[in-house]
Regions:
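Membrane-embedded alpha-helical bundles of multi-pass transporters/translocases
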Residues: 2, 8-468, 472-475
């Protein structure tokens, strides 16, 4: 069972108490490029590869994806526990990061290899390969993001450190894979050959970028030996860390909006705007805008505050989605207004990505301040759990909504179906994102001033970490 402790914290539990050297910052962030290229390939192309290239039944793939995401979401918590319990001369992050990358790259190549199977054998192969890929990706993804709160305790430096890997991740996943993946696959031969060659290139890039990260991470071990965490303790951590619960809640609400936008966009442009070609313009411009949002995040927080940065992150997408909704009704073929809407939406989501990473890093420090334990692995595993759970349930919700309104593939849709697509694409995401700010405003208390007190308290080896009662009274 977890107990309050008096172990040295803060300064002893971060690699750099102040400014992080540029080499460390950028080589750490560089790893996210390959990491999210491999994730983007699975997220964007695995379904069409399974159904159109190796001919797995679409109904089976839909069920498989849903089951795999649910399993993988809870597997993340287990991985977070393993990371927090790891003790080695290389620390608790690097071993999992290195081993997970190599295994995941190998499984990724196998997944995009055609073994000329059919029937039950093909279904078994697809299920095993896809689930194994998700599990092995978790092995390296959880420790990667768990490094963030351990690089520095300086608030402004943490904002910079948090945003850099998100920028590289957006370039890898949204711009390279989602934006130009189709053209690259065609250029590499198209069909199975194009997919397999592209997978080999991505796997090699993945290994190289993570190797650069691992080699340049400081070898200094942080913190003292801490009490081991059991699976039961995970729920105790969530129960006792109130700010972790509210951070999870607001990130969940926001992510519901993102998942609906990404899941419905293809249908929106094909059947509401009647122009599938507009999807590429929307996605490429939006991807660039997301990177811009991430780049300006540290400056926005410095000029305004984190609270106002998150307010912008919630309001901008709502404005952009309303522009997109009105454009779809009155000028569905207007590509300029569509691009403008996409840029506004994704500038906001770029700011949110920066905010979310900083929120979770602050929650780690707050957990140490309040409970005497950091639990980076558990905290950051909850982020990936949220993404996977919302992806699973959003996909299911979209399918049910389209079915209930009479959606017919490759046909002109009824007005009821078009309106349901509009609601799924524009209204539900906007509501989810605005609700996220309501939760933040009313329940999340780790603002700039409060975090200065937290960091000051945990940075002193002589400071005894407060009990829950003392912390709540101080708040």
């Amino acid at each position: 069972m977890l107990k309050n402790s008096t172990q040295p914290a803060g300064g002893g539990n971060v690699m750099y108490p102040g400014k992080v050297p540029g080499k460390v910052k950028y080589t750490f962030a560089f790893g996210a490029l390959g990491k999210d290229m491999i994730y983007g390939m699975i997220a964007t192309f695995s379904m069409i590869y399974f159904t159109d290239i190796i001919k797995v039944a679409p109904a089976f793939i839909g069920i498989m994806f849903f089951a795999a995401k649910i399993w993988d979401a809870f597997n993340d918590l287990f991985m977070g526990m393993l990371v927090d319990n790891t003790r080695s001369r290389f620390g608790k992050f690097v071993p999992w990061l290195a081993v997970g990358t190599l295994i995941n790259a190998f499984v990724f190549i196998i997944l995009f290899t055609d073994f000329h199977l059919s029937g039950i054998g093909l279904c078994v192969f697809a299920a095993v390969a896809y689930i194994l890929w998700g599990m092995t990706y978790t092995i390296m993804d959880i420790p990667y993001w768990s490094i963030v709160p351990n690089l520095t305790s300086d608030p402004h430096e943490r904002e910079k450190v948090s945003v850099l890997p998100r920028i590289f991740a957006s370039i890898g996943q949204s711009l390279i894979i989602a934006g130009f993946g189709v053209q690259i696959i065609k250029g590499l031969g198209g069909g199975y050959t194009g997919y397999h060659r592209f997978a080999l290139i991505i796997a090699a890039t993945f290994i190289f970028t993570i190797a650069v990260t691992v080699i340049n991470l400081p070898k200094k071990q942080v913190g003292k030996k801490a009490e081991k965490v059991s699976f039961k303790d995970i729920f105790s951590i969530i129960k006792r860390n109130d700010q972790l619960r509210w951070a999870v809640a607001l990130i969940l609400l926001y992510n519901v909006g993102i998942q609906f936008i990404m899941g419905v966009a293809t249908y929106y442009f094909a059947y509401v705007c009647n122009n599938s070609g507009m999807l590429s313009a929307f996605m490429i411009s939006a991807s660039i805008a997301e990177v811009v949002g991430l780049i300006i995040f540290p400056k926005v927080t410095k000029m305004l505050s984190r609270k106002k940065a998150f307010l912008l992150a919630c309001i901008l997408p709502a404005i952009g989605l309303m522009i997109l909704l009105l454009t779809g009704i009155f000028a569905p073929q207007n590509i300029v207004l569509t691009v403008i809407a996409g840029v506004i939406v994704k500038t906001g989501t770029g700011l949110e990505l920066g905010c979310a990473t900083v929120f979770l890093a602050d929650v780690v420090d707050y957990g140490e301040y309040k409970l005497g334990v950091r639990n980076e692995g558990v905290v950051f595993s909850l982020q990936t759990l949220i993404v996977k759970l919302t992806a699973a349930f959003t996909s299911l919700s979209i399918g049910f909504a389209l079915d209930l309104t009479g959606y017919v593939p490759n046909q002109i849709q009824s007005l009821a179906t078009q309106n349901s697509i509009r609601v799924l694409m524009c209204v539900i995401p906007a509501v989810g994102m605005l609700l996220a700010y309501v939760v933040y405003h009313r329940k999340y208390k780790l603002n700039d001033a409060y975090m200065k007190k937290v960091v000051s308290a945990i940075s002193s080896p002589q400071t005894e970490l407060t009990s829950e009662k003392t912390t709540e009274e101080a708040a």
